[in-house]
C-alpha cells in the first residue's frame, strides 16, 4: 500500500508538471496574442518563466515557504527539546531523514510540511499548537506531516504551488503591460480586425481570466485528497487514531491564523483562515473536518 502510494504520487508529480507546462504555454500564447501582438513571443516568455520558477521552487521551496509564513528554524534539540524529539521519533518510525523544524509565532494551532523530497523536507508548527495539544496529540499531528513527507506529497504540493503562483504572475505581468501600453493590441484589432480575429481575442481573454482559477482548483483538489491519505498514514505510524482525532477537534475549534500566507493555505493540516466551506467543496483547500474525523473513528 505504502509503496504503491509513493509510486502513484511520483506519477502524479509528472502529471502536475505536464499540466504546469501546458497551462503556462496556453496562458503565454493568450497573453502574447492579446497584449503584445505575438502569440509566439508570449509562449517563449512563459516557457522561460516556467523553467526559472520551477528551478527556484525546487531548489529554494522550503526557505521561500517558511519565509512567507514567518517560520523560524530550530537548529538543535536544545532550542525546543520536546518538539524536536517528537519530530525525530516520528521521522524514525516513518523511515525518513530528520526534517528541518520550524516554529511559527501564531496563537492558532496548526502545522504543515513542505520541501522537495524526504531528504529536503521541513515541518512547521505554530506556537498555538504547542500550547494546546498534549504529547499524544502532537504525535498524531507530526505523524500526519511525516506521512506527507514519506509519500512525496510535499513535492506534489511544491509543484502545485509553483503552478498557481507562476500563472498568477504571468497574468499580472500581461495585464500591467496592457495598461501601461494603453491597450495597443485592442485598438489595432478595433481598426483592422476581422470576425475571426475578434473571436480569437475573446477566447484568449477568457483563457487569461480562467487560467488562475483552473490552477487554483487543481491545487485545492490535490490538497483535499492528500489530507485523507496523511490522516491514515498518521494512524499507521502512531497506532493511535484517538490522538489525531483529539488534535483535529482542537484545531477545528480555534481562531484563524494571522501569520499564514494565503498561497500556502493548502499546505496546512487545517485551513488556516477558517474559510466558509462551499457546498460543492471545489473551492475548499481541505476536506470537511467532520468527514476526516469520521473516517479516523471508523479505522
Swiss-Prot record:
Subcellular location: Cell membrane
EC number, UniProt record: 3.4.24.-
One BP term from GO: proteolysis
Disulfide bridges in this chain: none
Gene3D superfamilies in UniProt: Metalloproteases ('zincins'), catalytic domain (3.30.2010.10)
One GO location term (cellular component): plasma membrane
Membrane spanning stretches: 16-36, 38-58, 159-179, 198-218
Membrane topology: Multi-pass membrane protein
Keyword Transmembrane helix applies: yes
Binding site for Zn(2+): 144, 148, 227
Cofactor: binding details: Binds 1 zinc ion per subunit.
Keywords, comma-separated and alphabetical: Cell membrane, Hydrolase, Membrane, Metal-binding, Metalloprotease, Protease, Transmembrane, Transmembrane helix, Zinc
GO molecular function, one term: zinc ion binding
One Pfam match: Peptidase_M48
Cofactor: Zn(2+)
Active site, per annotation: 145
Enzyme class: hydrolase
Family the UniProt entry places it in: Belongs to the peptidase M48B family.
NCBIfam families tied to this protein: PRK04897.1
Protein name, as recorded: Protease HtpX homolog
Source organism (scientific name): Lactiplantibacillus plantarum (strain ATCC BAA-793 / NCIMB 8826 / WCFS1) (Lactobacillus plantarum)
